[in-house]
Amino acid sequence: MSKLLSYTARIILRNSRTTVRQLGQEGVRGFAGFVSGQRNAPQPAYGRPVPGLLRQKMVSSIGKRSMFIQTQDTPNPDSLKFLPGVEVLGKGNTYDFPSGTAAHCSPLAKLLFRVEGVRAVFFGSDFITISKEESAEWSLIKPEVFAVIMDFFASGLPILHEARPNADTEILDDDDETVMMIKELLDTRIRPTVQEDGGDIVFISYENGVVKLKMQGSCSSCPSSIVTLKNGVQNMLQFYIPEVESVEQVFDDVDRMADKEFERFEKNLKQKEPAGAPVGIGGGPN
């Protein structure tokens, strides 16, 4: 009797093990089928697999837009320095575009002037300085400038079609010793410092002890440009070149137009002020 019970127990145990094993295998197969079904099932719109061609286009687009562009403030609140992380014009070279009409020799400058609010463009060795209209907001301009710079460098087009940067300080056959020394100092001592602030100084002429220079980039409309010119540039030139008596800033037609507009704005502002209004430290009403 005990042997029969033992034999019956072994059969029941064997059958139960088989059942558990089968259930386990079926469970695994069922789970695998569920996962497979989920993979093949239609996905919601936000999670749908990207078609092959579209995926290739996206990868290509991401590759083109992998440039990391940094920005750097300048002494001029209306000018911002963009550093794309690649060479722009090369070491020591600069090119100024005070207006859109001057951008005929640069495809990149033309595109940047299409951004609403951009007033001037300046290329340096490894940076691009954008000067905006006073009423424009950087929060609106910066994203568009980023996109233009990234797309342009991905295209492989030349930055300049013609004209040589820094032709103003090239030593000419008819330059006398004083002019040669002025150009040398500008290139080696003065320009590198000014270019760090997103601007440049261009040599115009030297006559009767007077050096005439033009400010470009962020320096062209910077409130402290006159101080920089007199206290910095003039002092250095006079220290090394005794023949230099003074330094004067030269303005082009675009600069003169901007100054006239500012003077007109100030005049209109004063006319709108009530008579006898108290004047504050800055010259405006308290």
From Swiss-Prot:
UniProt entry tagged with the keyword Ligase: no
Residues annotated as binding [4Fe-4S] cluster: 219, 222
One Gene Ontology term of the molecular function aspect: iron ion binding
GO BP, one annotated term: iron-sulfur cluster assembly
Any one annotated GO CC term: mitochondrion
SUPFAM superfamilies: Fe-S cluster assembly (FSCA) domain-like, Hypothetical protein SAV1430
Region (Disordered): 267-286
UniProt keywords, alphabetically: Iron, Iron-sulfur, Metal-binding, Mitochondrion, Transit peptide
Places the protein is found: Mitochondrion
UniProt transit peptide range: 1-15
Region (NifU): 182-250
Family as reported in the entry's similarity comment: Belongs to the NifU family.
Purpose of the protein: Molecular scaffold for [Fe-S] cluster assembly of mitochondrial iron-sulfur proteins.
PANTHER family per the UniProt record, alphabetical: IRON-SULFUR CLUSTER SCAFFOLD PROTEIN NFU-RELATED (PTHR11178), NFU1 IRON-SULFUR CLUSTER SCAFFOLD HOMOLOG, MITOCHONDRIAL (PTHR11178:SF1)
Protein's name in the database: NFU1 iron-sulfur cluster scaffold homolog, mitochondrial
